[in-house]
Regions:
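Terminal, membrane-proximal amphipathic helices
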Residues: 1-108, 138, 142-155
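Membrane-inserting effector segments that mediate pore formation, membrane fusion
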Residues: 101-136
Length: 155
């Protein structure tokens, strides 16, 4: 995700190559291309540290507000991000330290991504703005299964 197109000096226009690259990335993500989704998750979570986990927990009210804003069509997203947040909260309670287990790093990335309004697909786009968020969260849950929904962690 760090290699997303950068805007040139004209703020309202992107070079055609950058527009095409971003469009291609969105299309592959929304089509469910597992390789693309995994690459985004790995790139986004590789530098996640315990301080990031603790920071996202401090932002839980923003996450809760986002839950309330999530439309009915995204019931599964709401459930999955709540499970991730519960796991992250449990990890924070026992003062999880670096290096974080992969499931916690990716769970933290998923929560951070959900909070971003302007990610690959801006959340403000009616009906589809949360599609990329839902795909990434679902993929993180699928990658780690019960590790993201169990209690009594020993970090």
């Amino acid at each position: 995700m760090k290699n997303l197109p950068v805007r040139d000096s004209k703020p309202d226009q992107e070079p055609a190559a950058n527009q095409n690259a971003e469009h291609d990335l969105k299309a592959r993500l929304l089509s469910g291309d597992a390789e693309t989704i995994d690459a985004i998750i790995l790139a986004g979570s590789v530098e996640i540290r315990a301080k990031d986990l603790h920071a996202i927990i401090r932002e839980r009210e923003l996450v809760e507000k986002k839950f309330q804003a999530i439309s009915m069509g995204y019931h599964e997203l709401r459930h999955q991000i709540r499970e991730i947040m519960r796991t992250l909260e449990a990890a924070a309670l026992v003062n999880a330290t670096d290096p974080l287990p992969r499931c916690l790093a990716e769970g933290t990335f998923a929560a951070q991504y959900l909070l971003k309004e302007d990610d690959l697909m801006p959340d403000s786009v009616p009906g589809v703005g949360l599609a990329d968020d839902a795909i990434l969260v679902k993929s993180v849950v699928a990658r780690h299964g019960r590790k993201l929904a169990r209690n009594g962690w020993d970090f």
